[in-house]
C-alpha cells in the first residue's frame, strides 16, 4: 500500500516494466532490459516524447495509407512528417530514401488498414537503410500483434536488430480495453540513457495504482489467459462474418482480402460505383463500412472499391 503512494521514476514502476519485459520475452521473442522500457498513458503521448528525444530537425515518414492521427501528432510537435506509399510488401524503402527521411514509423506485423504483414526480406532492407546513418531509426508500432489467429506471431523487427536502430511501441488499450490508457515503448540502450539524462523531469502519466495492478495481472499469468480467450472469441466472430459474406455474394461480386492477424479484414466489390455511393447505400441498410481510401494521406486518383470490415 505504501508503494502506491510513492512517486516512481518517469519510466514507470519497476514491477510493471519487469512484467512487460518478461511478457515480451515469452510472447515476442524479445530480450530487453526493463530499464529500456518507458510506460506512458497512450501511444500518442509516447510519440510526443519520441519527437522530443529524437529532435524536430528530423524528417519523419509514415505509411500511406495509415492512421492519420500519427502524422497529425508529429506535425503538432513541430516535426516534419511525410507520407510514403506502400506496395504489396509494406512501406517502400526506395521512397523512404527519396524522401530523405531519418525516422520511419511503421506497423510491420499487421498494417492498418491494408492488413499487410511485412515479409522478412523487407524488414532487413529497412534495417540496412537505418544502419546507413547514425541519425536514422525505425519506430515499430506492433499494432494488433496479440491477435494473430493462426500460427505463431511473426517476430518483430527489434528481435533481429543488432545495431540498436529499432524503437518498439505497443499498447494494452487494444488487448484489454480502450479505457486503460497504458502503453509502452522499448528504447535502444543508448537512447534509454539519453532519455533519462534529458527528459527525466517528465512524470509518468499512468497512475501508480494502475501500474501495480497491471503488473500483477501480467506476472500471475492472467494476461496470457485473457489473450488466449480473446483469440478464440474473435476467431469465432471472424468465421461468422466471413460465412455471412460468402453467403450473400459470389466470389466475382465480392473478394475477401484477409490476413491471419488483427481484428479487421478488407472486402473488395466488383463495381463501377464510386466508393462514397457504396458507403451511402450500405448505410441505408444499417451497414457502416469505410472505404480504404479514407486512410490515404495523399488522395488517390481512383477509388479502389475496398472497404474495411471490423469485428
Segments and roles (model prediction):
Residues 192-210:
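Active-site C-terminal subdomain of aminotransferase-like
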Residues 141-142:
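Walker B catalytic acidic pair
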Amino acid at each position: 500500500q505504501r508503494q502506491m503512494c510513492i512517486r516512481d521514476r518517469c519510466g514507470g514502476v519497476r514491477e510493471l516494466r519487469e512484467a512487460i519485459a518478461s511478457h515480451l520475452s515469452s510472447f515476442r521473442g524479445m530480450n530487453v532490459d526493463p530499464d529500456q522500457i518507458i510506460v506512458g498513458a497512450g501511444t500518442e503521448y509516447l510519440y510526443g516524447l519520441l519527437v522530443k528525444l529524437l529532435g524536430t530537425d528530423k524528417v519523419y515518414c509514415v505509411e500511406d495509407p495509415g492512421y492519420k492521427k500519427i502524422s497529425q501528432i508529429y506535425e503538432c510537435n513541430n516535426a516534419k512528417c511525410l507520407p510514403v506509399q506502400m506496395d504489396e510488401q509494406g512501406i517502400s524503402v526506395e521512397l523512404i530514401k527519396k524522401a530523405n527521411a531519418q525516422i520511419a514509423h511503421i506497423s510491420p506485423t499487421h498494417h492498418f488498414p491494408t492488413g499487410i504483414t511485412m515479409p522478412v526480406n523487407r524488414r532487413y532492407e529497412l534495417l540496412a537503410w537505418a544502419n546507413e546513418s547514425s541519425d536514422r531509426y525505425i519506430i515499430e508500432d506492433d499494432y494488433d500483434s496479440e491477435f494473430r489467429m493462426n500460427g505463431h506471431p511473426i517476430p518483430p523487427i527489434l528481435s533481429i536488430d543488432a545495431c540498436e536502430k529499432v524503437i518498439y511501441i505497443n499498447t494494452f488499450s487494444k488487448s484489454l480495453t480502450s479505457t486503460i490508457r497504458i502503453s509502452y515503448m522499448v528504447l535502444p540502450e543508448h537512447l534509454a540513457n539519453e532519455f533519462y539524462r534529458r527528459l527525466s523531469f517528465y512524470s509518468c502519466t499512468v497512475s501508480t495504482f494502475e501500474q501495480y495492478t497491471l503488473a500483477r495481472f501480467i506476472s500471475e499469468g492472467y494476461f496470457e489467459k485473457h489473450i488466449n480467450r480473446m483469440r478464440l472469441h474473435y476467431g469465432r466472430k471472424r468465421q461468422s462474418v466471413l460465412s455471412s459474406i460468402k453467403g450473400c455474394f459470389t466470389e466475382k461480386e465480392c473478394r475477401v482480402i484477409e490476413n491471419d492477424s488483427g481484428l479487421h479484414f478488407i472486402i473488395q466489390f466488383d463495381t463501377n460505383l464510386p466508393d462514397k455511393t457504396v458507403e451511402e447505400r450500405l448505410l441505408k441498410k444499417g451497414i457502416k463500412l469505410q472505404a480504404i481510401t479514407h486512410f490515404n494521406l495523399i488522395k488517390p486518383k481512383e477509388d479502389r472499391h475496398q472497404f474495411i470490415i471490423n469485428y
